[in-house]
A protein has these predicted regions:
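Sec-dependent N-terminal signal peptides
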Residues: 6-9
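Conserved polar/disulfide-associated segments of primarily extracytoplasmic proteins
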Residues: 60-147
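Short, conserved catalytic or interaction motifs in soluble domains
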Residues: 18
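Positively charged n-region of N-terminal signal peptides that target proteins for export
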Residues: 1-4
């Protein structure tokens, strides 16, 4: 039986209607959420603000990286205000070996991005880039679709303060930090991951 998730946009997003999303279909999840004009926010960052849905918890902020938590899984959000300010274009090549690989370029949106999901052992590595921000996670198959749903909400609600960012770009510290956490490089080979295993077989983040 297909699972359906009822999304109350009155409380969560635009306040227009109740939408049912087939959560077995990643394309549908992404397309429906990105088709809305999401304007709510409940978190502030340095030069931007964004919204995290009910059930997602903000754990910590380390410079430009935000650690989020949902249903036993961690999501890592990085917002690239430098790329936003300079309107940096993205390069993406569809990965035919990935579990899911798709470029995002909706006709009615100026924002661009991509989603890539790669299966590693019994887990799924999610690499979701949209609106000059990235969410990464390593999740179980059971949590994959809800992770994509939450990531789509979060990335689509990011709003930038260009004036404040311009002031911040004069800060050498910020530029150094942006370089340190330069996660916005597309990997041409499937074996390259930001997530790596250590000698004991534990997953570690490489940044």
């Amino acid at each position: 039986m297909k699972k359906y998730l009822i999304l109350f946009l009155t409380l969560i997003l635009s306040g227009c209607s109740v939408v049912r999303i087939n959560t077995n279909n990643l394309d549908t999840i992404i397309d429906v959420v990105l088709s809305k004009n999401n304007s709510l926010y409940n978190r502030d960052g340095r030069g931007y603000k964004y919204y995290i849905p009910n059930g997602v918890t903000h754990i910590d902020t380390d410079d430009l990286t935000h650690t989020l938590y949902y249903n036993g899984e961690y999501l890592y959000l990085y917002v690239d205000i430098v790329s936003y300010y300079y309107n940096k274009d993205i390069k993406f090549k569809k990965n035919d070996y990935a579990y899911y690989s798709r470029k995002l370029n909706l006709d009615n949106k100026k924002k661009k991005g991509y989603v890539e999901v790669i299966k590693k052992d019994d887990l799924y590595y999610v690499n979701f880039y949209y609106n000059y921000a990235r969410i990464e996670a390593l999740v179980t198959e059971e949590d994959l679709n809800n992770t994509i749903l939450n990531a789509t909400y979060i990335l689509s609600t990011i709003k930038y303060n260009k004036g404040l960012i311009k002031t911040m770009l004069d800060d050498e510290y910020l530029i150094n930090k942006a370089g340190k956490y330069d996660l916005f490089k597309i990997n041409d080979k499937t074996e390259k991951f930001i997530l790596q295993k250590d000698k004991e077989g534990e997953w570690l983040w490489s940044f």
